[in-house]
């Protein structure tokens, strides 16, 4: 498997190091364990915590999507 070299802060390094479950655990293992390819939206939102700005934006887009769906159902509106 190819490898990449990245630069991270000392703080990020220490955080990753503390998340290793054993000496055999690689930093790649840690990253993939905590950030799998697919995550549930609820997990992401729980991780970032309350965000009123994001909630307002989601509500606005959701309303726009519902309105568009209604126009598709009733094209005369």
Swiss-Prot record:
Name the record gives this protein: Putative antitoxin VapB3
Family: Belongs to the UPF0330 family.
Gene name tied to this protein: vapB3
NCBIfam families: PRK13696.1-1
Keyword entries, A-Z: Toxin-antitoxin system
Gene source species: Methanosarcina acetivorans (strain ATCC 35395 / DSM 2834 / JCM 12185 / C2A)
Function: Possibly the antitoxin component of a type II toxin-antitoxin (TA) system. Its cognate toxin is VapC3 (Potential).
Domain of life: Archaea
